[in-house]
Amino acid sequence: MAAPMNGQVCVVTGASRGIGRGIALQLCKAGATVYITGRHLDTLRVVAQEAQSLGGQCVPVVCDSSQESEVRSLFEQVDREQQGRLDVLVNNAYAGVQTILNTRNKAFWETPASMWDDINNVGLRGHYFCSVYGARLMVPAGQGLIVVISSPGSLQYMFNVPYGVGKAACDKLAADCAHELRRHGVSCVSLWPGIVQTELLKEHMAKEEVLQDPVLKQFKSAFSSAETTELSGKCVVALATDPNILSLSGKVLPSCDLARRYGLRDVDGRPVQDYLSLSSVLSHVSGLGWLASYLPSFLRVPKWIIALYTSKF
């Protein structure tokens, strides 16, 4: 089996489950040495064992990415053990999902102000810390890739105020880091997965109360055809092995766009759902859902329309 990332060194934060786990599995399958982080060593070891069975090497490291001292220690370990080499950093760690589920349908003034920290400390704050220390290894080498996991919640209202602000800041983090890193040969991008079948969401979607909420009921129907966690991993591998990656630096990269660009399918063989297709967009618009089934899948929402729709001017 081809190992296109053999010899490369990667760090994936928040990899004990969910998207981070899926990314770690695919990076190891591609032959890389992958450092995975999380807060519980036992779950990290389970992922590491699974990842190594696919190829590559996987090193579990307990690290709370909201704590700068722990982030610094992580990258010092990578520096020491890999002779200063770091090829790919994936800023994925996120601890806000349960808070989002617990505060659903509540306005920002109806929730504790501390919800900001619950959603963005292990997330935006940690992503910045990791980017700082990761770049210190990449810049001297004149190469590297930083991937920030974000979402369309950065463009339009989604879930709550701290979530949207945090995701918008993630996209800006990637764009501004890319600006400063470009002359050093280091790329930085923002990756938008679609709806993803994470363990936590699977558990939540199985609850009976979901059927009583019209919004969640609609979400559940889309969830059955959602992306697996490993599709994001396939996207990261494709980006990391793209010789023209600098041309994408600073951009927001939806997973469905990357699937089209690199000819990717999900790990179970399914085609990747294109959430930027006209039919997909219309299926979520009240009164226009009937029209979606009549539109061919190749018709997509032009990016300039998205830019106009989300313009703040």
From Swiss-Prot:
Omega-N-methylarginine PTM positions: R21
PTM-bearing positions, type N-acetylalanine: A2
Subcellular compartments: Endoplasmic reticulum
Enzyme category, top tier: oxidoreductase
UniProt similarity note: Belongs to the short-chain dehydrogenases/reductases (SDR) family.
Entry remark concerning the domains of this protein: May be attached to the ER membrane by its C-terminus segment.
Record's protein name: Dehydrogenase/reductase SDR family member 1
Organism (species): Homo sapiens (Human)
